[in-house]
Amino acid sequence: DKALRSLRSRSFFLELAMEHYADELLALCGVGRTNLLYTGGGHCYLLLPNTERVRRGAAAWNARFNDWLCAQFGVALFLAHGFTECSGNELINHPAEDSPYRQMFRRVSSALAAHKLRRYDASMLRRLNGRRADGGRECRICGRTDSLVDDRCEWCRLFVELSEKVQRCGMYYVSADPGAAYDFALPAADGTAYVAFMDEKTARGRMNGGGAVTRIYSKNMAYTGLRYSTRIYVGDYAYSNSIEQLARSAAGVKRIGVCRMDVDDLGQAFVAGFERPDR
């Protein structure tokens, strides 16, 4: 089932989707990536204007993105959001003895938790409950029953195909033009974004030829003179793409193990704040 390739591209897809979500929200609010405080691991923190227009826009964009996630992946994926008002003093943790920075992040976390507990409105629940399985065979990777080819659904086939491109291609070109070649589509705040994986030469040629471009994500490198480009960090290294070859390299029994690492309590660290005892 090419599980190794699928795992890599699934993880990358989630990171790229999160970057895209944040960039669309920033553009919707009329600010740049300077206002993106942190993104990674399926989370992001942004500093946005405290206006009614921004609050409505953020809520509408979140609802649109979750509608798309639900249509594509059912209840397996959901993007919760929450926000709170804050002042300049809270951002610089003043007065420090009152820990306003910590309280600010606690308010955000509470709003986020509340959204997770109430994910769907009545119309979405009716849509989910109205779905009926077609009685066909299930995808042998994820269990979906629609659009199977070789016992794989559309997204699982895509993730296998993308794995090689994640390693080989250094540019991820986002455009609103459905006529150009693309690898997959994501929702945009005002339409659809089409994502194509390519090398630098192809990306520059497409731009110089007048091709539509919304933004470009460059892998691990910052490119001078390449407009619309944002560097993102991608772990594209691999000893081998073959599980069999990895197993043959083992000492003793020819099999592999999986090591999964994570940063403990990263969210709690943001909530608690990074206070300096001497200040």
Short names for language-model regions:
Residues 1-279:
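Regulatory and interdomain segments flanking nucleotide-handling catalytic cores
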